[in-house]
Curated annotation (Swiss-Prot):
Gene3D superfamilies: 1.10.10.410, GatB domain, N-terminal subdomain (1.10.150.380). Allows the formation of correctly charged Asn-tRNA(Asn) or Gln-tRNA(Gln) through the transamidation of misacylated Asp-tRNA(Asn) or Glu-tRNA(Gln) in organisms which lack either or both of asparaginyl-tRNA or glutaminyl-tRNA synthetases. The reaction takes place in the presence of glutamine and ATP through an activated phospho-Asp-tRNA(Asn) or phospho-Glu-tRNA(Gln). This is Aspartyl/glutamyl-tRNA(Asn/Gln) amidotransferase subunit B. One of its GO terms (molecular function) is asparaginyl-tRNA synthase (glutamine-hydrolyzing) activity. The lineage of its organism: Bacteria, Pseudomonadati, Pseudomonadota, Alphaproteobacteria, Hyphomicrobiales. Its EC number is 6.3.5.-. Belongs to the GatB/GatE family. GatB subfamily. It catalyses: L-glutamyl-tRNA(Gln) + L-glutamine + ATP + H2O = L-glutaminyl-tRNA(Gln) + L-glutamate + ADP + phosphate + H(+); L-aspartyl-tRNA(Asn) + L-glutamine + ATP + H2O = L-asparaginyl-tRNA(Asn) + L-glutamate + ADP + phosphate + 2 H(+). The gene is gatB. GO terms for biological process: glutaminyl-tRNAGln biosynthesis via transamidation; translation.
C-alpha cells in the first residue's frame, strides 16, 4: 500500500431501486484531439476558431487521387500518451477504413484503427473522495486500448432555415480514442477518471483537454445489473463535453434503466444523447456493431512500424506525471494527500506551488495557494496563468508572517492589496504602516483598557476561560489588527489569571 492509498473496507455504493439494489457498470471512450500543428494525414492547420472551411486541404476534402501521408508528430504524441497510461506500446499497428455515410465525412469512411491499435492495454489509478471520514479510495481503472483516427467535420443546422451547412475544418484532425475497460462503478468514479485522464494528457502536452472547445469528448457506456449477476445491456451516451455532464448523464441513465427493468421491461442497446438543459438522455439511434462498419485495412496506408528505441527515446523525455509528483510533494514537503491531490490537478498549479514552497514551509505554502490564491482565482474566473500575484510575491507574504513582521490577519489584507494593485509586499508593509505591533508596553495598555471597560466579562472569563478569546478579539480590534496575536493572547490570560 502506497502513502497515497487510504482505501477503506466499505463496500461499493449501490443504487437503491424499488425492488432492491442495483450496480451500475460504466465504460468510457474518450476522444482526445492530438496536440499537433497539422492534421493526421495532411498538412492543413488544426487551429481552433478559424473561418469555416479555411483549414481544409485536398486530402481533407477527399478529392480524387489525393493520398494520405501519416503525420509523425501525431504518432509520437500517441506513444507518449500510451506510456503515460502505463500501457503496452505496439511496435506495429494498422490503419483501417471505418465505413459509414454522413455529410461531414467527405471520404465516405473514417481512417481509424480496429484490430491492431498503436497502444494496447494499460491502467491508471484514480482517487475517489474524500468520504465523510476525510479518506480517499484508490481505484485502478483498466485501459483497453488507444488508437489514432481522423475526426469528422461539423454539420451546422442553425445557419439557414431550410439548409444545413458543413464545416470541414475539423475533418482529418488527429484524435486519440482512449477506451477504458468497464471498471467504473459510479458517476463519482467516472468523473474522477475523466479528470485524471485530462490531467495526464495535459501534463504530457499531447492534448489541451479543453472540453468546451471539443478537443476532448466522452462517449459513456452505461448498464445496470443486480449485484453478483451478469452485466446488463449497455447504452452509449455520445459526445458528452464536460465532466459535470458526464456525472449527470450517468445518474439519469442508470435510473432510467432501473425503472424500465423494475417495470418488467427490457433495455434496448442503443445510442443516446444527453440534454444538459433537461438533465436527461434521449434516444438517437440503435447501437451499431463492428460488422456494421465493414472495417478493412486502408490500402493507401502501409502498416505503421517503429522500434523499441523510438519508444525508449520518447519515454526518456517525459515530464513528471501527476501520481509521481503527488507522492513526491507529500514525502518531501509534508503536505496532506488531499492538498497534494488539489495541487497536481493542473501542472501550472503544481509549478506555481513549488515555486512558492521553495525554501519555505510546505504546509503554509499549500494553505495560501489552495485557500487564498485558488479561491481568489475561482471567484475572479481566472486561470493560474492569469494570476495577478506571482509566486515570488506570495512567497514574500509568507516570509513576512514567519518573520513576525505582520500577523495572519494583516497578511490577508496585504494579499488583497497586492492582488488589486501589485507591488513588492515588503515595501507595501513599510509604506502603509502595516507592521504588527510587538511592543509589549503598547499591547499591555490596550489589554488593560479592554479589561477595565468590561468588568462583568472579567468575572465570567475566570469561570469560563474560553471567554479569553473575546478579550483577545477586542484588543486586536482596538489596535487595528496590528498587534501580535500571540503576545495579546498571553497578556490577556496573564491579566485574567487564567492558567495555560
Amino acid at each position: 500500500m502506497s502513502i497515497i492509498d487510504t482505501r477503506t473496507p466499505e463496500p461499493k455504493r449501490f443504487i437503491s431501486g424499488a425492488t432492491g439494489d442495483w450496480e451500475v457498470v460504466i465504460g468510457m471512450e474518450v476522444h482526445a484531439q492530438v496536440t499537433s500543428e497539422s492534421k493526421l494525414f495532411s498538412g492543413a492547420s488544426t487551429a481552433f476558431g478559424a473561418e469555416p472551411n479555411s483549414n481544409v486541404s485536398l486530402v481533407d476534402a477527399a478529392m480524387p487521387g489525393m493520398l494520405p501521408v501519416i503525420n509523425l508528430e501525431c504518432v509520437r504524441q500517441a506513444v507518449r500518451t500510451g506510456i503515460g497510461l502505463n500501457a503496452q506500446i505496439n511496435l506495429k499497428s494498422v490503419f483501417d477504413r471505418k465505413n459509414y455515410f454522413y455529410p461531414d465525412l467527405p471520404q465516405g469512411y473514417q481512417i481509424s484503427q480496429f484490430k491492431q491499435p498503436i497502444v494496447g492495454e494499460g491502467k491508471i489509478m484514480i482517487s475517489v473522495g474524500p468520504d465523510n471520514k476525510g479518506q480517499f479510495e484508490d481505484v485502478e481503472i483498466g485501459i483497453e486500448r488507444l488508437h489514432l483516427e481522423q475526426d469528422a467535420g461539423k454539420s451546422m443546422h442553425d445557419q439557414h432555415p431550410t439548409m444545413s451547412y458543413v464545416d470541414l475544418n475539423r475533418s482529418g484532425v488527429a484524435l486519440m480514442e482512449i477506451v477504458s475497460k468497464p471498471d467504473l462503478r459510479s458517476s463519482d468514479e467516472a468523473r474522477a477518471y475523466l479528470t485524471k485522464l485530462r490531467t495526464i494528457v495535459r501534463y504530457l502536452g499531447t492534448c489541451d483537454g479543453n472540453m468546451d472547445e471539443g478537443s476532448m469528448r466522452a462517449d459513456v457506456n452505461v448498464s445496470v445489473h443486480r449485484p453478483g449477476g451478469e452485466f446488463g445491456t449497455r447504452c452509449e451516451i455520445k459526445n458528452v463535453n464536460s465532466i459535470r455532464f458526464v456525472g449527470q448523464a450517468i445518474e439519469y441513465e442508470a435510473r432510467r434503466q432501473i425503472a424500465i427493468l423494475e417495470d418488467g421491461g427490457v433495455i434496448d442497446q442503443e445510442t443516446r444523447l444527453f440534454d444538459p438543459v433537461k438533465g436527461e438522455t434521449r434516444s438517437m439511434r440503435s447501437k451499431e456493431e463492428a460488422h456494421d462498419y465493414r472495417y478493412f485495412p486502408d490500402p493507401d496506408l502501409l502498416p505503421l512500424e517503429f522500434n523499441q528505441a523510438f519508444v525508449d527515446a520518447l519515454a526518456a523525455k517525459l515530464p513528471e506525471l501527476p501520481d509521481v509528483k503527488k507522492q513526491r510533494l507529500v514525502e518531501t514537503l509534508g503536505i496532506s494527500v488531499y492538498d497534494a491531490s488539489i495541487l497536481v490537478t493542473e501542472k501550472a498549479i503544481a509549478d506555481y506551488y513549488e515555486a512558492v514552497a521553495e525554501g519555505r514551509d510546505g504546509k503554509a505554502a499549500a494553505n495560501w495557494v489552495i485557500n487564498d490564491l485558488l479561491g481568489a482565482l475561482n471567484k475572479a474566473g481566472k486561470d493560474i496563468e492569469e494570476s495577478p500575484i506571482s509566486p515570488a510575491q506570495l512567497g514574500a507574504i509568507i516570509d513576512l508572517i514567519k518573520e513576525g513582521t505582520i500577523s495572519g490577519k494583516i497578511a490577508k489584507d496585504l494579499f488583497e492589496i497586492v492582488w488589486n494593485e501589485g507591488g513588492d509586499p515588503k515595501k507595501l508593509v513599510e509604506e502603509r504602516g502595516m507592521k504588527q505591533v510587538t511592543d509589549t508596553g503598547a499591547i499591555e495598555k490596550a489589554v488593560d483598557d479592554v479589561i477595565a471597560a468590561n468588568p462583568d466579562k472579567v468575572e465570567q472569563a475566570k469561570a469560563k476561560p474560553t471567554l479569553a478569546g473575546w478579550f483577545v478579539g477586542q484588543v486586536m480590534k482596538a489596535m487595528g489588527g496590528k498587534a501580535n496575536p500571540q503576545a495579546v493572547n498571553e497578556l490577556v490570560k496573564s491579566k485574567l489569571g487564567i492558567e495555560e
